[in-house]
């Protein structure tokens, strides 16, 4: 049995870790197969945000080691010019965000004890970066984050790409087809009774 199969011990360990950080019982996890043939887990946004919040403040040696590795090598997370890397660099490794598939972005803000999870309903990946930056700025206006979200780029690239991944070209060379920005309101709620778990 290959390691990517659900019954392999590696996948069982992964599911146990997902349960540990999200608080969702392994039996209740939605399971599928991703583009790499490995098991993929479906979670509610709240569970994703909770996992990132818990991981961001955990003193568990493995969490500390992983956070230190990410802070030391931010380019390995996504690459130059990508928000996942830019956020790590701009915050000295204290804040971390990771792009997911189908319009998902999650972030941990350890100095504020927060985790974030975004999902663009139609799976549009282009709108995620401006949405996350706008959300960080809105939260930063209300809660100290340990960094200045106003210094983050609104969009990593304002140029729209054609369907084949190449930039659209006009007579005068590279042409920008427009940009993206987020427009929404943010209402923070006070934790309800029972929400006061570590990292919520």
Regions found by a protein language model. Give the residues of each.
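Structured C-terminal helix/loop/strand segments within mature extracytoplasmic catalytic/sensor domains
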Residues: 57-200
């Amino acid at each position: 049995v290959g390691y990517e199969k659900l019954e392999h011990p590696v996948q069982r360990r992964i599911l146990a870790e997902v349960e540990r950080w999200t608080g969702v019982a392994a039996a209740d996890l939605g399971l599928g197969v991703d583009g790499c043939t490995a098991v993929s887990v479906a979670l509610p946004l709240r569970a994703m945000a909770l996992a990132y919040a818990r991981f961001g403040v955990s003193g568990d040696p493995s969490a500390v080691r992983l956070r230190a590795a990410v802070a030391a090598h931010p380019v390995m997370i996504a690459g130059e010019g990508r928000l996942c890397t830019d956020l790590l660099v701009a915050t000295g490794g204290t804040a971390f965000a990771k792009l997911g598939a189908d319009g998902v972005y999650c972030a941990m803000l350890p100095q504020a004890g927060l985790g974030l999870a975004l999902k663009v309903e139609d799976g549009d990946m282009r709108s995620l970066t401006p949405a996350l930056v706008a959300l960080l700025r809105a939260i930063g206006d209300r809660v100290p984050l340990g960094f200045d979200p106003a210094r983050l780029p609104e969009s990593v690239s304002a140029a729209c790409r054609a369907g084949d991944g190449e930039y659209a070209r006009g007579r005068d060379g590279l042409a920008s087809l427009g940009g993206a920005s987020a427009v929404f309101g943010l209402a923070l709620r006070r934790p309800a009774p029972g929400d006061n778990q570590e990292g919520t």
